[in-house]
């Protein structure tokens, strides 16, 4: 089959400025005709490269660098210079590059963001812009925005309050919207809402790029968020997707519950994490050969991630036929004060739902011995929380214990894959939030740890939601997504210890998630894009961003020769 002809794209830009436009720049892939017509001939070396050669050049530079942070800077500079090449590089080996553009390296990048800030990659909206947020949105050069990732920087990964430095998270997240889900990067907008910071180091740092003040809270904060949501929806439409990211626990659930029925919004820390964790559990059940309702699940952590997973597990149990009250009893949570039980002081409304009749306990090892869970899920960002004794006990209670160490970055993981596999003698069904290398057991068997990365979830969800114009994102979408992800795990993957499809298939996974969301949306009459496409897969695929270069030339074409005949005589 012959390759498709490049898409023709017209621009009024010419000369040097065109080579500085990352949406149009092709570096040495410009043809001679393009260079001459666009007035950039002479600005580039007299060499003509294919995109494959350009990728090779980037990879060579990437591999010569000694630290992941330097590799991150290399890729961010490429994103600023040549957008299509940046995404071609990412998609050429997503397993290799994802840990650089997102977790775990993005955590270090956020800590250093004030030091390495180069140029705007998103909007910085501050509390002092109240009453004028609509005007600030007008500063962004793109008129069509279909997806926004927004944070206030208060709980960046497991690193805490990084204030304005948290901008690295929306930027990295939206890069994965495109690399993993095919969203058009020009239709994506990273946003930081700067309301101050409680981080003393940042407040004293002369290089800090954010507001030097304590965080604004209460009604002033809420009014600010209300104005932001209204301004975004007014400018970009009610079906502009707004993803909340890395908000503090105290705000995350509250804001999700406040906005979920008014706007097209979701919280990835709550719902995305829940979906990928439940996907891992569903895949694990194919190894344990039993049902979700046969499990007793213990969480180390009771923040937004833990509660989000717990709520989605309850939904999955209800779908399996278990009444909600019985489903809740299958789930136990441990927070910083110990086991969450009825009558314990200072329980939030969300935690109260999962409080059971039991004596108070504080020590995690003792709690594991008491509850005897079949599945242990860590989401508290306490590195090493799953001690050797806990792992031994899990293996003693269960033939195939399910152990998920989901905290990010790697330094916050509850245990490593090697510790888990070796202490349980390879019987554990393990997944982690950050990537771990394969582990070879004494018997020669090599196990590949499953990475429960939210990137399996949010790109496909965003692609599906945007494609059919959904105006609300329900929890059922995330349960459906979990089921789709689990279905993509083959028996061979399970034998290798993988609970998730290989990352290099993530675009295909996103396509299947989006296709299912689109099918359900039209069936449930919640889609707003009409007429309804007959072939849903082809429809979604047509929405996906191509990393192939466009042909940037004027639209030239021929007329019939007889029409073009030059008149040489005046008719008498």
Curated annotation (Swiss-Prot):
Molecular-function GO term, any one: electron transfer activity
Chief location bin: cytoplasm
UniProt xrefs under SMART domains: malic, Malic_M
EC category: oxidoreductase
Cofactor note text: Divalent metal cations. Prefers magnesium or manganese.
GO biological-process terms attached to the record: carbohydrate metabolic process; malate metabolic process; NADH metabolic process; NADP metabolic process; nucleotide biosynthetic process; protein homotetramerization; pyruvate metabolic process; regulation of NADP metabolic process
Keyword check for Calcium: no
E.C. numbers: 1.1.1.40
Localisation per UniProt entry: Cytoplasm
Summary of pH dependence: Optimum pH is 7.8-8.1.
Active site: 102, 173
Family matches, as PANTHER family: MALIC ENZYME-RELATED (PTHR23406), NADP-DEPENDENT MALIC ENZYME (PTHR23406:SF17)
Family according to the record: Belongs to the malic enzymes family.
UniProt name for this protein: NADP-dependent malic enzyme
Naturally occurring in which organism (per UniProt): Homo sapiens
């Amino acid at each position: 089959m012959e390759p498709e002809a490049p898409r023709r794209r017209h621009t009024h830009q010419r000369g040097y400025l065109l080579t500085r436009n990352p949406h149009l720049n092709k570096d040495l892939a410009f043809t001679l005709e393009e260079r001459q017509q666009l007035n950039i001939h002479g600005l580039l070396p007299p060499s003509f490269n294919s995109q494959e050669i350009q990728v090779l050049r980037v990879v060579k530079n990437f591999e010569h660098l000694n630290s992941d942070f330097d590799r991150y800077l290399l890729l961010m500079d490429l994103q600023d210079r040549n957008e299509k090449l940046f995404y071609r590089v990412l998609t050429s080996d997503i397993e290799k590059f994802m840990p650089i553009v997102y977790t775990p390296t993005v955590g270090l990048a956020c800590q250093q963001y004030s030091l390495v800030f180069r140029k705007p990659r998103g909007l910085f909206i501050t509390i002092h812009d109240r009453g004028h947020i609509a005007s600030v949105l007008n500063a962004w050069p793109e008129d069509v925005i279909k997806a926004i990732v927004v944070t206030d920087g208060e709980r960046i990964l497991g690193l805490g309050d990084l204030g304005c430095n948290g901008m690295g998270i929306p930027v990295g997240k939206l890069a994965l919207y495109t690399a993993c889900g095919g969203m058009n990067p020009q239709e994506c907008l990273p946003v930081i809402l700067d309301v101050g910071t409680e981080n003393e180091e940042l407040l004293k740092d002369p290089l800090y790029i954010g507001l030097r003040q304590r965080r604004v809270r209460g009604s002033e904060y809420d009014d600010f968020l209300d104005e932001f949501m209204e301004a975004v929806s007014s400018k970009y439409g009610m079906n502009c997707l707004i993803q909340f990211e890395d908000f503090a626990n105290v705000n995350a659930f509250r804001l999700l519950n406040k906005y979920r029925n008014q706007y097209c919004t979701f919280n990835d820390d709550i719902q995305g994490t829940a979906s990928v964790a439940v996907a891992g559990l569903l895949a694990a059940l194919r190894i344990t050969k039993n049902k979700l309702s046969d499990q007793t699940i213990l969480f180390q952590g009771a923040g937004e991630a833990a509660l989000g997973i717990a709520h989605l597990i309850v939904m999955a149990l209800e779908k399996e036929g278990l009444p909600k009250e019985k489903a809740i009893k299958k789930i136990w949570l441990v927070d910083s004060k110990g086991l969450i039980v009825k009558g314990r002081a200072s329980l939030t409304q969300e935690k109260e739902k999962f409080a059971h009749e039991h004596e108070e306990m504080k020590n995690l090892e003792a709690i594991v011995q008491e509850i005897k869970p079949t599945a242990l899920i860590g989401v508290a960002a306490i590195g090493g929380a799953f001690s050797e004794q806990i792992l031994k006990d899990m293996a003693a209670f269960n033939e195939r214990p399910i152990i998920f160490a989901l905290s990010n970055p790697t330094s916050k993981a509850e245990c490593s894959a090697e510790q888990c596999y070796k202490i349980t003698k390879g019987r554990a069904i393990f997944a982690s939030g950050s990537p771990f290398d394969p582990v070879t057991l004494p018997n020669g068997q090599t196990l590949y740890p499953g990475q429960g990365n939210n990137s399996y979830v949010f790109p496909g969800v965003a692609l599906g939601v945007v494609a059919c114009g959904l105006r609300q994102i329900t929890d059922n979408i995330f349960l459906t997504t979990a089921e789709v992800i689990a279905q993509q795990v083959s028996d061979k993957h399970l034998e290798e210890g993988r609970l998730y499809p290989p990352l290099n298939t993530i675009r295909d996974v996103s396509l299947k998630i989006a296709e299912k969301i689109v099918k359900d949306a039209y069936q449930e009459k919640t889609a707003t894009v009409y007429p309804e496409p007959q072939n849903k897969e082809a429809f979604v695929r047509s929405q996906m961003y191509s990393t192939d270069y466009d042909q940037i030339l004027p639209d030239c074409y021929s007329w019939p020769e007889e029409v073009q005949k030059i008149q040489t005589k005046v008719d008498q």
